[in-house]
Design a protein with these regions (language model features):
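A non-catalytic alpha/beta surface segment that caps or lines the substrate-entry region
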Residues: 2-61
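Solvent-exposed, acidic/flexible segments
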Residues: 12-23, 51, 68, 91-99, ...
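Extracytoplasmic/secreted proteins, especially bacterial periplasmic and envelope-associated proteins
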Residues: 17-37, 97-104, 108, 117, ...
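Structural recognition of the beta-strand scaffold that forms the well-ordered cores
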Residues: 26, 37-41, 55-59, 68-73, ...
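Alpha-helical metal-binding/catalytic segments enriched in His/Glu/Asp
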Residues: 58, 71, 76-77, 81-130, ...
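Metal-dependent peptidase/peptidase-like ectodomains
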Residues: 123-257
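His/Asp/Glu-rich mid-to-C-terminal helical/loop segments that flank catalytic regions of hydrolases
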Residues: 259-317
Length: 318
């Protein structure tokens, strides 16, 4: 937040001391927990003072060195003047929430053994076209995505907290989105991670999977939207894009994308009003925000742990 000179103004694309300062802080957090951590800086225009992308990548060794998997969130925020709301300086919802979730997951994973080598990542340049995750996945470096290992799955955290179980000022629940993929054939389930996604929400967390509102939610870009436009728990297999999971889905990984209310369901999207104070206000208090943040974080944590132990969750091209 803006308190205590917080790590705000994390815009990417020009020399930005605020972004560099934040990246160094995040790197120190992962290193302090014992992770092998790197800052991945990529330039493609000959000017090293203006990196095309700057990511923080923490690695955890797995039992099987023939495969790799990961979780991530973008740490950059919408630049000034950006659509649709004019850009932001704090980016509390998009995507400081996801950034902090990765810092907390890193704490939890310290004592957990994983099957495959695992990366926990904070991406840059998501708001400029997924350039950060693409730089990691499509370049050759010692701490980039290995090309000689099977990429099994990836879970993406974006825009967290303004979603079920939080309630809108109008009295209806905020929408909760979690999409798995790839969704190759819209008529059938294509990947096993979809079963993991459904099991976590339906059976473990006891989410109201069939709850619907009167009317419709204000935004929908997935190919199943006509079936789900009034569904609170929009949890299913789909082709939805717009964030870094696409980078890994395109490489055959099974993916899950967590997203809260967006576009017209959250008026502060990509605007100067995207602050922690505003998030607390629109969900009805700090306790309500904590509940909604904890719900999606437990979901993602459980998804990761179950997918890690599910051999059928593997690259669709394997």
């Amino acid at each position: 937040s803006t308190e205590c000179g917080g790590y705000i103004n994390r815009w990417m694309g020009t020399p930005n001391p605020a972004f560099e300062r934040a990246a160094s802080f995040f790197q120190g957090h992962f290193e302090g927990l014992g992770y092998e951590t790197h800052i991945l800086r990529v330039t493609d225009h000959g000017n090293p003072t203006e990196p095309e992308s700057l990511n923080v990548i923490a690695w955890k060794e797995g039992r099987d060195d023939s495969c790799v998997q990961g979780m991530g969130a973008h740490m950059d925020i919408a630049p000034p003047g950006g659509p649709p709301g004019g850009g932001t300086y704090e980016g509390a919802y998009d995507n400081t929430g996801g950034t902090v979730s990765m810092m907390l997951f890193a704490k939890a994973f310290v004592e957990i053994e994983v099957e495959c080598d695992t990366f926990l990542a904070l991406w840059s340049s998501e708001e400029e076209g997924l350039r950060g995750s693409s730089a990691f996945a499509n370049n050759d470096c010692d701490y980039c995505l290995p090309t000689d290992k099977e990429l099994r799955f990836y879970i993406n955290m974006d825009m967290m907290g303004i979603s079920y179980p939080a309630i809108k000022p109008t009295g209806e629940p905020y929408p909760y989105h979690a999409w798995s993929g790839p969704d190759i054939d819209p008529e059938v389930q294509d990947v096993e991670i979809t079963s993991v996604l459904d099991h976590v929400h339906r059976d473990i967390l006891g989410a109201p999977m069939d709850m619907r509102i009167e009317g419709t939610y204000g935004a929908g870009c997935d190919q199943h939207w006509p079936e789900h436009e009034d569904l609170v728990m929009d949890v299913h297999e789909d082709t939805f894009g717009r964030s870094d999971h696409v980078t890994f889905r395109d490489l055959g990984a099974q993916t899950i994308f967590h997203l809260g209310a967006y576009d017209s369901d959250y008026s502060a999207y990509h605007s100067p009003d995207d602050t922690l104070d505003n998030m607390i206000e629109v969900v009805g208090g700090e306790d309500e925000l904590k509940k909604s943040m904890e719900f999606v974080m437990w979901a993602a944590m459980l998804e990761f742990m179950i997918a890690d132990q599910t051999p059928e969750v593997r690259n669709v091209n394997a």
